[in-house]
Amino acid sequence: MADYDLTQKLIPHLDRHLAIPLLNHLSDIAIYPAEQLARAQYDLAKGTNMVNYVEQFHAQIENAEPTDFARLRDEATAKYQELQEKAQPVTKVIEDPDAVAKLRSGGDKDRNLDLLRSEYQIDIDQINALYHFGQYQYSLGDYGSAGNLLYHFLILSPSYELNISAQWGKLASNILNGEWDAALMQVRDLRETIDNPHGTSLAKPLAQLQARTWLLHWSLFVFFNLGENQGCQGLLDMFLSPAYLNTIQTSCPHLLRYLVAAAIISRRAPKPANVRSRDHVKELTRIVETEEYQYTDPITSFLKDVFADFDLTQAQQRLSVAESVVRSDFFLSGFADEFVENARWLISEVICRLHRRIDIGQLSKTLNLSNEEGEKWIVNLIRDSRMGVEAKIDLKENMLHITRPHATPTATLIETTRGLAFRSQAIQFAMQSSVGEPRERGERGERGNKGGRGRPRTQEVAA
């Protein structure tokens, strides 16, 4: 499945530490030569201060340049002690319960800064030392300590630019520490910061596009670890919003794989009672058709086969390849069974809408099921009230009879209005973007091939 591996497209938009798990996954599934992967892992890790981890891969590389790892350890230890000493005045304060209570009751950062100056003789430089110490902890791979230090820095610091950097660092720390609820909150905070830049460096359209591209990639870790309900639904809501859908189409069309996969995986997931159901599959079919010239793979092509071309024979063959792609994908591998199950459900829905009489044996064959499995599948299919059809099984003829109720004018009007509302939002966003900075002809396609320019700096926590 190396032909469909997205790792090389994803890594330029990730911090080095976030990219390490992707390469470890490739090592586990062995779709690339071991020597090549060891070299890639070494090149990635040597930009960090995780000396023992770097040494591990250095030993696996033939004819590697000699490296004095003992000296690197001594330098890392000395740097750690230096930064720890500079940050110590602030760390003492945040470890003091009485001081923390006073800071929490302060109400805002200006009052807290006055309190720190007057009672603890702490200035801005010492607060910034907390950021640099947290950043260094991150580079050492101590993500728990890094996240804690950056959390307190965000509470105390008045520096908008450093706060943005700390937000990225805290998100990465939460991800690598497996704190998914905290990471989701950080994704929302960063999204708010990026979408409302307030005259900062993010106010420039290109910087905002780059930041949104990073956030889309980093958020994959969060959404696909929150499950098919909260995670996939959250991904769909964010990725299909006009600003972020425009970003995907402009700079990272390969993320369409995860959009389509999330829509299929969560197709039958229970929705909260207060959330209106939205047919993402129909929207995505239009998007996949539009962006086919930029990106296509077996997962996106499967959706097009079913809902655009109605080529169910091709869809059946494509599903087999798509399943292999899903099982080898870092983010999707845990949802392989749900993907296949719901993909079969989509094929069944289309068949039931196209035909009034369906041969159960033929349907089972189309779904790659035995006759017995096919009969059980069809029983479950009939029970699903969201199919929008009534069905009965004729056991004598081994046929499924479909009755379709006609849609009411009101339902048709509502569905049409929803589509118009979504397209209007997309047009409005496109017009606003055009007013902000006109695009040159061909810019969209060029950016799509230059994702590597969005790579975070290697020695910094923040992107």
Swiss-Prot record:
InterPro entries xref list: eIF3e, eIF3e_N, PCI_dom, WH_DNA-bd_sf
Record-annotated PCI domain positions: 224-407
Bias kind Basic and acidic residues: ranges: 437-449
Location(s) in or outside the cell: Cytoplasm
Region (Disordered): 432-463
GO MF annotation: an example: translation initiation factor activity
Keyword check for Protein biosynthesis: yes
One record GO biological process: formation of cytoplasmic translation initiation complex
A cellular component annotation (GO) from this entry: eukaryotic translation initiation factor 3 complex
Xref: SUPFAM superfamilies: Winged helix' DNA-binding domain
Domain of life (superkingdom): Eukaryota
Entry keyword set: Cytoplasm, Initiation factor, Protein biosynthesis
Predominant subcellular localization, coarse grouping: cytoplasm
Coiled coil: none
PANTHER family: EUKARYOTIC TRANSLATION INITIATION FACTOR 3 SUBUNIT E (PTHR10317)
Family: Belongs to the eIF-3 subunit E family.
Subunit architecture: Component of the eukaryotic translation initiation factor 3 (eIF-3) complex.
Chain's role: Component of the eukaryotic translation initiation factor 3 (eIF-3) complex, which is involved in protein synthesis of a specialized repertoire of mRNAs and, together with other initiation factors, stimulates binding of mRNA and methionyl-tRNAi to the 40S ribosome. The eIF-3 complex specifically targets and initiates translation of a subset of mRNAs involved in cell proliferation.
Protein name: Eukaryotic translation initiation factor 3 subunit E
Source organism: Cryptococcus neoformans var. neoformans serotype D (strain JEC21 / ATCC MYA-565) (Filobasidiella neoformans)
